[in-house]
Amino acid sequence: MKLIVKTFQEITIKSRPVRKRFIRQLAKNIRAVLRDLDPELKVEGEWDNLEVETAVVDAKARREMIERLTCTPGIGHFLEVHEYPLGDFDDILAKCKAHFGDQLAGKTFAVRCKRAGKHAFTSMEVERYVGSGLRRECGAAGIDLKQPEVEVRMEIRLDRLFVIHRQHPGLGGYPLGALEQVLVLMSGGFDSTVAAYQMMRRGMISHFVFFNLGGRAHELGVMEVAHYLWEKYGRSQRVLFVSVPFEEVVGEILTKVDDSYMGVTLKRMMLRAASRVAERLELDALVTGEAISQVSSQTLPNLSVIDRVTDTLVLRPLIVSHKQDIIDTARQIGTAEFARHMPEYCGVISVNPTTQAKPYRVEHEESKFDMAVLERALERATQRTVDRVIDELGQDLQVEEVGEVLPGQIVIDIRHPDAQEDEPLALEGVEVQALPFYAINSRFKELDANRQYLLYCDKGVMSRLHAHHLLNEGHTNVRVYRPA
């Protein structure tokens, strides 16, 4: 199988040195993406295209090659072709008839020819000769240049003829590795996954940082979607996944910061931490999935206040996107199902968030915050290459859910204190303890290890995530309480 890869159009208008550098990078990426399918793959470059040749004959492997190339940044489109030495017009006609003759009976068709190099004929002369010959010899209904039922396409390059069988769309953008690198703040929801995709599609190597607010299970869920994005759109490059434990940071905010400023303060803490990670990794910008006024922390005044904590460039590729458009894109790229089951935590910590944050006020609220907590979170951050995070998913533990409380078991209400106060959990004959989600991981070890504990929250999401984390920490006496 031979493929002709056409580069993204914006590459073709670059200066000669830049264009050559981008083409070389794209060739390198294609080899990396397809290496496991064909170690002997040949990729050779020309000024405006690359020729990819494989001896692999397995149909499944070929389909996988096509799929991977459609998801490789830097490719405008690519063609499946058969290559022949260039002969005379009769030879060209014979080759086209051999490939398309059985498709033309009773159909309208058009012949399209592109040329590169010096020849004694024009592209139009080739089209006319081949078109009239095919119409005469193949029983075609006629020639229709505007809306043909069949297109007979070919390219002539110097002394070679390429008969084109199929054209596949590319992802566009620039080759990964040709531009700068960024750090994506990844929550695993619709917005952050689509924002990451947009940056990767444009051609920027995108590393991931995750601020863990919800326990081990949430972390694993984000690892899973990060691995998916890397494998599908960025596998040609080495990408890092950094996880920062932020439960203690959230606890500090909840206990010391005014309710209306909790969300803005949390985002500022995330940007502070992300900037430190980006600086350490020598990355050029931060990327978030924020869109104007989608939630309270994303108003222009709030975004302005949030950005003041960092000198690092903050990119927001979705800033003017509608939520439905973001969801549609997530479905298109395959992250929607991940996001649909991935809870967003930023909204659970503030009841009456401000939409008009004032710099002096947020600075006053942050003066109550013990910055040593943020430093500890950064010190405890873990880093691994994203291709290895999937290994950790295999070490996952299942969480048992129960609908009834047995004698001797204790139910722990992990909801936010406001929810506990508004709707107290009262179960007849059952001991209920209140231990908010942001404290459960640090304080669970203080509980009697000989008792059985059932974690409870309204929807079962937070309880499941924290039970999962505790199980992975070695606590076998924890389940999830999900009343019928």
From Swiss-Prot:
A molecular-function term among this protein's GO annotations: CCA tRNA nucleotidyltransferase activity
This protein's pathway: Cofactor biosynthesis; thiamine diphosphate biosynthesis
Domain THUMP: 63-167
Disulfide bonds listed in the record: 346-457
Span of domain Rhodanese: 405-483
Cellular compartments annotated: Cytoplasm
Protein name according to UniProt: tRNA sulfurtransferase
Gene this chain is encoded by: thiI
